[in-house]
Amino acid sequence: MDFGSLETVVANSAFIAARGSFDGSSSQPSRDKKYLAKLKLPPLSKCESLRDSLSLEFESVCLEQPIGKKLFQQFLQSAEKHLPALELWKDIEDYDTADNDLQPQKAQTILAQYLDPQAKLFCSFLDEGIVAKFKEGPVEIQDGLFQPLLQATLAHLGQAPFQEYLGSLYFLRFLQWKWLEAQPMGEDWFLDFRVLGKGGFGEVSACQMKATGKLYACKKLNKKRLKKRKGYQGAMVEKKILMKVHSRFIVSLAYAFETKADLCLVMTIMNGGDIRYHIYNVNEENPGFPEPRALFYTAQIICGLEHLHQRRIVYRDLKPENVLLDNDGNVRISDLGLAVELLDGQSKTKGYAGTPGFMAPELLQGEEYDFSVDYFALGVTLYEMIAARGPFRARGEKVENKELKHRIISEPVKYPDKFSQASKDFCEALLEKDPEKRLGFRDETCDKLRAHPLFKDLNWRQLEAGMLMPPFIPDSKTVYAKDIQDVGAFSTVKGVAFDKTDTEFFQEFATGNCPIPWQEEMIETGIFGELNVWRSDGQMPDDMKGISGGSSSSSKSGMCLVS
């Protein structure tokens, strides 16, 4: 075994051990006690002033932010008058993700418990007109059945109950978490593992957040290389877009900080490798996926594209290499470096961007284009997943870009026998040359794609909630990445000096913790549950007063954990 191979084996072993400690295959996540001790809720004297600087909109505080939602629901749980609204909210969410055969019974339970004036949890705040519609006759079980009730419930909770919450201890606890969230957590909070790959401006490596044990991927953008290649604008665009998107089908940005040499983006780690690797390298004698597996990934990609397009973001770089698998076998789209955000009032954009073979005809011809280019790329990606080759060139075929452009614009696509009629029809609808006729994002949704016969057996509600079993689960003992010596190293950048403008850009880029992913990490790793300590008598907890846990013996018997 040569030194390079030995280096890979050692690095893989350390990475797999860390991964096992976090994903549950070992008993306790690996946490650094020194950094764990720094995750401490502050006394109110340090954080109460945040009340004046935070955006206190109901939707943001109580629905979008994970810790905010938990604390608001705990507040509702503590007051009997709010229990009907809370339980209805939770039961509707439960109904929306239930198996089809369980929905009828759950629907009847909702009608009986919350819409009957004689019921203990009758929701008297609901408009009589909404209630009457559900009492007119037999209820037809369907997706979104109780959305009017949910919207009315949240509208009610956003009024007087929300104002009560803002004056409660639970909101003060939220301010404590927001203060902690804002504390700088930079390079020293992370332990680097092996290099996973290379980006345009630096390496991508696995890393571990020391305090929680959570694993991430750290994309390092070398400052000198960025400046030399005039990459500042592209890097900032990618970072700002990553901060805007929060979907289980798109990699999330959790932290952004700088080191002496690099700008660092700490993002969701996808341990299963990319789709291209699985198409061609896992079973080389029979490349490609069975159709059900390809359809599962396609459905998850559709959910990711819909999230981007609802936020007016054109992806422009969908391809198998940019679709990554997580530990459980679910996929997310990644690498938003070529994405562009449409401005208010702007319906289309222009510019040559993407990967040869995946770019839509209108883009190749220099025309203006919209989100439709991403659905053309989806068609190419689905075709490649099933056929193990692209629709416009055979695997390994050397094709000049001019010829490839001609094929995409002018030639029909041929489908091998691997395609069912439904998958062929779906691909053809995506690979339509005319963007106006192409299947895609319409009326702010991807519902027309969801309604295609190809997905007739797919439960979209459960897919979107992350409740469906993926068709393939990556091996937890395998590192789906090139050997370290095959990743390659960057050459040293010389002759680049930084000035005040550069320093200001670096500081603007390094914004620290991203609220929603950071809060998800605190909940997922158990930190929230460990610090969310309340007195059973309802009085102010010691941490809010600035009293450490070990210094107040009088209140020990009155403490309880609420996660």
UniProtKB/Swiss-Prot annotation:
A lipid is attached at C560 (S-farnesyl cysteine). The lineage of its organism: Eukaryota, Metazoa, Chordata, Craniata, Vertebrata. One of its GO terms (biological process) is G protein-coupled opsin signaling pathway. It is found in: Membrane; Cell projection, Cilium, Photoreceptor outer segment. Residues 539-563 are annotated as: Disordered. This is Rhodopsin kinase GRK1. Residues 1-189 are annotated as: N-terminal. The modification Phosphoserine is found at S5, S21, S491. The gene is GRK1. Residues 456-563 are annotated as: C-terminal. Residues 550-563 have a biased composition (Low complexity). PROSITE patterns: AGC_KINASE_CTER, PROTEIN_KINASE_ATP, PROTEIN_KINASE_DOM, PROTEIN_KINASE_ST, RGS. Residues 190-455 form the Protein kinase domain. Retina-specific kinase involved in the signal turnoff via phosphorylation of rhodopsin (RHO), the G protein- coupled receptor that initiates the phototransduction cascade. This rapid desensitization is essential for scotopic vision and permits rapid adaptation to changes in illumination. May play a role in the maintenance of the outer nuclear layer in the retina. One of its GO terms (cellular component) is cytoplasm. InterPro entries: AGC-kinase_C (IPR000961), GPCR_kinase (IPR000239), GRK1_dom (IPR037716), Kinase-like_dom_sf (IPR011009), Prot_kinase_dom (IPR000719), Protein_kinase_ATP_BS (IPR017441), RGS (IPR016137), RGS_sf (IPR036305). Interacts (via N-terminus) with RCVRN (via C-terminus); the interaction is Ca(2+)-dependent. Interacts (when prenylated) with PDE6D; this promotes release from membranes. May form a complex composed of RHO, GRK1 and RCVRN in a Ca(2+)-dependent manner; RCVRN prevents the interaction between GRK1 and RHO. It is linked to Night blindness, congenital stationary, Oguchi type 2: A non-progressive retinal disorder characterized by impaired night vision, often associated with nystagmus and myopia. Congenital stationary night blindness Oguchi type is associated with fundus discoloration and abnormally slow dark adaptation. Retinal-specific. Expressed in rods and cones cells. Residues 561-563 form a propeptide. Autophosphorylated, Ser-21 is a minor site of autophosphorylation compared to Ser-491 and Thr-492. Phosphorylation at Ser-21 is regulated by light and activated by cAMP. It is a lipid-anchor. ATP binds at L196, G197, K198, G199, G200, F201, G202, E203, V204, K219. One of its GO terms (molecular function) is rhodopsin kinase activity. Residues 58-175 form the RGS domain. It catalyses: L-threonyl-[rhodopsin] + ATP = O-phospho-L-threonyl-[rhodopsin] + ADP + H(+); L-seryl-[rhodopsin] + ATP = O-phospho-L-seryl-[rhodopsin] + ADP + H(+). The active site is at D317. Residues 456-521 form the AGC-kinase C-terminal domain.
